[in-house]
Amino acid sequence: MGANYSEIQELLQQRADIQARMNLMPYDGNPEIKVSNDARYLYMRKRVAGKLTSTYVDLYSDELYQLLLRNAKERKDLNKALRKINKELAVLGYEDKELSTRVLQNLDFARANMKANIYDQAVLEGVATTFPQTEDIIENRKVSGVSATDVQKILNLKHAWEFILDRDVIQSESNYHMLCHIAKLVNEGFFYDGGRIRGIPVQIGGTSYVPPLPVESAVIGQIEEIRSRDKDPIETAIELCMYCMKTQVFKDGNKRASVIFANHYLIAQGMGLLVIPEKDVPEFKKLLVRYYEGEPLEFIGTFLKEHCWKRF
């Protein structure tokens, strides 16, 4: 499988991305219209264990019916793409591997905490939502008083977290290409290719630090060097996170992508989660500015280990 490694990793990422997209879709099945007492109602029809089931959606409207039709077509296309990817993986000799019990437990731990993690990340980004609003957005429910931009950011965080929690993806290396794919998901809807390395100067608010333009080969090499050091997994995860933040690898979404990237590494080691809790965001931002401006990693690293490392 060695010669086909890159191709297999790309297919696995595509497969996990499709599965994450399908998880975001609110409806599964084909729409049908039922009439009762001169009123029309919309249902979703789906075959489960050989039996047809029908789930109520809402009162009929042309707009909702067209939405359900588009949803059904998109899901059908995604299922077709999944079958194609699985065939290609089989041709390349790929077989699904068993994950260790510890990693499986960590995946469950991450899924159980995903809503809280997304809310904490949203607070770090200045997204103005309450936890109940964030929860409604994650569950694809309607919310009021929240900007379309903030809704998109939260959905993108959900998409990125679901991506790294896929069993195939968690077995993939925490390398530059993984970071780029996470950034692409985080920036979806805001940039044409949010996972492309930054090619323009940027400034960071609240600090005199101006990150130089990143060089792709240098970023690839530094990530590999950090991963190869003989350190505890939490220390490696923190260093990966802080290096990517300070480097400002992408045009936007660097904090979001860096945290999720670090969690991809940490979960794969079965070592918990790394998320800045809402109450610790102000202190983290102060330490982050000091780190940007030259303070050694150990100061913010100690803070992250003591206040932001969730273990199970």
Where would I find each of the regions flagged by the language model?
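FIC/Doc superfamily catalytic core
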Residues: 1-41, 47-312
